Amino acid sequence: RDLVRSRGLGDVYKRQGNGQAEGKADMKNLLGGKGANLAEMNLIGVPVPPGFTITTEVCTEYNEMGQEKVVALLKGEVESAIARVEELMSSKFGDIENPLLVSVRSGARASMPGMMDTILNLGLNDEVVEGLTRKTGNARFAWDSYRRFVQMYGDVVLGMKPTNKEDIDPFEAIIEEVKHAKGVKLDNELEVEDLKELVKKFKAAVKEQTGKDFPACAYEQLWGAVCAVFNSWMNERAILYRKMESIPDEWGTAVNVQAMVFGNMGETSATGVCFSRDAGTGEDLFNGEYLINAQGEDVVAGIRTPQQITK
């Protein structure tokens, strides 16, 4: 039985073919909502970054068998799937000179509060960030991506994000401290040296709070993120929501791993959220908003005012 379903050109068994994907839209039970729809988008010719989906069945087995056994069973399939993404992106996961970075997202059958937040830019470390700088000629982009990754990974995988509104996110406190010292108001006003300082302070906070160094190995980072998705299925908030909505625990969640596409490379890149229908009326009206030189959750986080995609 396949535990990993690939998207992009070909599948986990490296079959070739433009616009091919193992999954499709009606496979939400196995691939989750995101995984099934990403596969369908690929099949109809939408340019979707290559990646793969670890199925919902693995989540169930993870909760029954435990982390160690499931990771051992999955290891070969995931490494094979990563190798296929490397081939398609002409880059290598964890490589210093030509790095492949990925995103990791949860993907239940239906959107569900309490599930793991997205992790972007996975695969960076102190050496890879220098390689990314050389590869792109853009030091600010490389270090901005790195500081975002350490914060996301620390918050989500290492459990450093506050669970209530009274507690302060240690990473946000550091950002505010550095911005105040620099005399700026916005994150995108920070310069390369400021971003390097953020990374250094972020990693020190990780060491202080967890007692361990921030993981430098790309595969260690990946397995940490994958297991965090599965663990989030059984967290208190997710369990409570499932009880309220009569969603069985056995459904599980899928994990989606995709090659990164960057919105923070400068004034010619952006991140956005869009809808094919009006959310209030259902009218066939394309709408959404975007932020230039930003990434991920910036659009909905209220850091800067986004622009309307239809203007």
Predicted segment positions?
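Single conserved hydrophobic/aromatic residue that forms the stacking wall/gate
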Residues: 1-13
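Nucleotide/phosphate-binding sheet-loop regions of phosphoryl- and nucleotidyl-transfer enzymes
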Residues: 11-311
